Amino acid sequence: MRKLAILGAVIFLLLLLGQWSGNQPERDATAAARAELGIAFEERFVDVGDVTLHVVFAGPENGPPVILLHGFPEFWYAWRGPAAVLARAGFRVVLPDQRGYNLSEKPAGLAAYRLDRLVGDIVGLVDALGYERVRLGAQDRGGAVAWRMAIEHPDRIERFAVVDASHPLASASADEDTISWYRTFMQIPWLPGYAARLGNWRLLASNLRATSAPGAFAEEEMDQFRSAWDRDGAIHTMGKWYRADAWPLESDGRVATPTLVILAENDRFIPAGFTRASLEFLDDGELLELGSGTHWVAGEEPERIGKILVDFFSRNAEWTAAPLGGTL
């Protein structure tokens, strides 16, 4: 009993210290992105049905719509660099904070974070903005949402590009296996969120920097992430994505939408075999191996990723993107 009491006291102190040490001031990521990139990012809240999402926009209102979905532990801000390239080319870029993240609504309960709800949010966003079809891009956990949307709502997607996220059935057909410690850790209720807060979010910040290219995630950028993680207990609702992960796929997983799968060379989270195996499920797909970059390549090489997306999203369209110059 004494050992249990000591253990309980240690856990309580850990939770208390984590809560205190992770407190952050409010920061305006939209204003920071405007100042950094010279793009007129604007923000508003959009009712998508079950929840209200915080959404940032860039580019001309009459441009072809592109929705970009962030992953864990990021938020819309992670896509700001490629979004600026797309906006300059004439696309209307839509950057939602997905449910449970940053300024978007954070419903209670685990069922609210099932994949069908997350997909429903993006379909609802397309409807709320008055679009019939969009070009869709995604990274990491945003890719899980985007893949399912491409499988189950192909009529809403014009073209689909995914970075560092494999098809949901690809792991079964690849010759690799992986055990992700952080996915296992995130299955534990509450504790990961408090542990993440310790030492000014040291666990998350150090993991991002250890798995990214040298120089990525500068301190100013990391401060924006810290504020997003702290806002209204977001770190806890972000974790619910992992605990509510299971949602059986009731089809063969075929994707008819033209799809570009982008593979970074040094992704330490998604095995390359999984990414390559994704092509087996595509009726009209292509694989682009970058030869550089990590799991966070959209932030490491924003100009390059942005130009790749401009090229892919402009294909077979009556609309022509504005010239950007440079090479991919």
Can you name each region flagged by the protein language model?
Residues 293-302, 306:
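Catalytic histidine-centered segment of alpha/beta-hydrolase-like enzymes
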Residues 58-103:
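Conserved HGGG/HGGXW glycine-rich cap/lid loop of the alpha/beta-hydrolase fold
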Residues 1-12:
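N-terminal Sec-pathway targeting helices
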Residues 14-55, 65, 92-94, 101-137, ...:
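Flexible "cap/lid" subdomain of the alpha/beta-hydrolase fold that forms the substrate-access gate
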Residues 320-324:
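C-terminal amphipathic helix plus adjacent low-complexity
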Residues 75, 203, 234, 304-305:
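Short phosphate-engaging motifs
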